């Protein structure tokens, strides 16, 4: 009673009551699921959960949380100061971001089963943090879903296994790994098998379905190939793979390197993106031709449009999928004792042609972006490629005629006559193209776009100001 009158209550409308009840049910379901997950992890011997996210490089970061506190972790209890990491656009005075773990990405660490890793999405003040790499990809996946597509992705993981040497350098583990053409050498693969076997077992334990692995074209270089997945899952797996490979290598007195090109006279490590779109409802591969293969390359009309979009934005994309100064030492015609770098140099496409930015493998039904290297942030790389491809579909872009020939054999004049553009020659050119491309800003959002440009310009400037041993050796006593 107030002033002799009954106080009126704000009675919710029936629809609001239903929504409130739905939220309570959802909350109860979440609690039940979290409790079940907690029990599952405890039974598996897990002591700590890692609420993870990535920096601008796609390197996993996180805190260790005792499983007893899993419930609060799943609700975003773990807060992070973004300013402490490379390329996360926050100031030291900004509020912390919260990592919301994705239980679908759970991986119990095979090298230490006391640990469980969760990829996470960053939130700020209860809303998705726009500059979170994983959120950037999720936005583009949502755009694809609105068009009726699921984006499938397979990434080939090329990397090096090295040991530290007494002189402070590094070398391949095997003393037999010294061939000029070491690709597919079973002897050196056997010498590295203790590491590779444990790594492949770990990948299969996680359900990745490894179907081959081999010694690659550089000394100490290896590749693992495993089944494709949706782009978010595959990006999570690449981030986890880099951590896992290093941890397993350390157990054997070695280290894994994901530097794109550690040797000037050897091939570099790619992370070729094998891509297709599937019908969201039926799962049908929409890149498989059904009477609409315009150039007899083994892909559909929609795949040609997708390819055209990627090529249109190829220079900007390069800044993201070849993100380091060292990346552009890989994207050259010559620079390997084996006779070829196997890396793309031109923004064009062709069937089963490894000299193009976009290759269409022999079986068709997918396209492969060969410019991507193993140092990429897969969330950002796949987000920008997907956005470019979707633009190509929406606008019906024409990819032009394919190039089946070895593009390395053409002179600069012949390349120009055909209207073919080079990929950026260095990180500076790539970042300039990224900054000038409106699609890059649209995909990344204002804050992450500005942060990426600023960080990469700084990286390029730092390299430009460095005096290398090559310069000293060449010029110190020349004049």
Q: Where in the sequence are the language-model features?
A:
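ATP/Mg2+-dependent ligation/transfer catalytic cores
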Residues: 16, 24-215, 234-237, 254, ...
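Catalytic-core signal marking the mid-to-C-terminal active-site face
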Residues: 247-250, 254-255, 278-479
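A generic structural motif
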Residues: 55, 123-129, 188, 228-234, ...
């Amino acid at each position: 009673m107030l002033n002799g009158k009954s106080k009126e209550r704000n009675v919710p409308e029936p629809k609001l009551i239903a929504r409130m009840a739905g939220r309570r049910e959802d909350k109860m379901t979440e609690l039940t699921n979290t409790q079940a997950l907690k029990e599952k992890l405890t039974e598996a011997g897990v002591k700590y959960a890692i609420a993870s996210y990535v920096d601008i490089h796609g390197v996993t970061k996180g805190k260790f949380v005792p499983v007893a506190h899993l419930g609060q972790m799943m609700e975003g209890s773990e807060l992070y100061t973004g300013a402490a990491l490379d390329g996360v656009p926050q100031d030291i005075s900004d509020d912390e971001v919260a990592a919301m773990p994705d239980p679908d990405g759970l991986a119990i660490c095979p090298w230490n089963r006391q640990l469980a890793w969760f990829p996470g999405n960053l939130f700020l003040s209860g809303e998705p943090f726009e500059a979170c790499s994983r959120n950037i990809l999720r936005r583009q996946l949502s755009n694809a879903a609105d068009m009726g597509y699921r984006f499938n992705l397979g990434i080939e993981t090329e990397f090096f296994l090295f040991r530290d040497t007494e002189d402070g350098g590094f070398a391949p583990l095997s003393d037999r790994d010294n061939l000029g053409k070491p690709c597919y050498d079973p002897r050196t693969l056997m010498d590295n098998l203790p590491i590779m076997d444990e790594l492949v077992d770990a990948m299969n334990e996680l359900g990745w379905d490894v179907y081959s692995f081999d010694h690659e074209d550089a000394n100490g270089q290896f590749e693992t190939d495993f089944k494709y997945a949706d782009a978010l899952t595959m990006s999570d797996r690449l981030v986890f793979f880099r951590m896992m490979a290093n941890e397993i290598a350390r157990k054997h007195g070695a280290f894994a390197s994901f530097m794109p090109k550690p040797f000037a006279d050897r091939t570099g490590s790619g992370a070729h993106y094998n891509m297709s779109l599937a019908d969201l409802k039926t799962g049908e591969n929409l890149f498989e031709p059904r009477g609409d293969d315009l150039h007899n390359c083994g892909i559909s009309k929609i795949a040609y449009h997708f390819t055209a979009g990627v090529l249109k934005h190829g220079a900007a994309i390069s800044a993201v999928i070849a993100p380091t100064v060292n990346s552009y030492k890989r994207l050259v015609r010559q620079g390997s004792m084996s006779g070829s770098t196997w890396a793309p140099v031109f923004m064009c496409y062709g069937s089963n042609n490894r000299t193009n930015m976009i290759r269409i493998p022999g079986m068709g039904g997918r396209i492969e972006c060969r410019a991507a290297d193993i140092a990429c942030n897969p969330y950002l790389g796949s987000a920008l490629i997907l956005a470019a491809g979707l633009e190509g579909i929406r606008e019906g872009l024409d990819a032009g005629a394919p190039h089946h020939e070895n593009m390395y054999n053409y002179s600069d004049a012949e390349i120009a006559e055909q209207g073919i553009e080079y990929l950026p020659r260095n990180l500076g050119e790539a970042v300039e193209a990224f900054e000038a491309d409106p699609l890059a800003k649209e995909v990344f959002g204002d804050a992450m776009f500005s942060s990426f440009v600023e960080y990469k310009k700084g990286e390029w400037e730092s390299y430009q100001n460095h005096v290398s041993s090559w310069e000293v050796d060449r010029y110190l006593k020349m004049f």
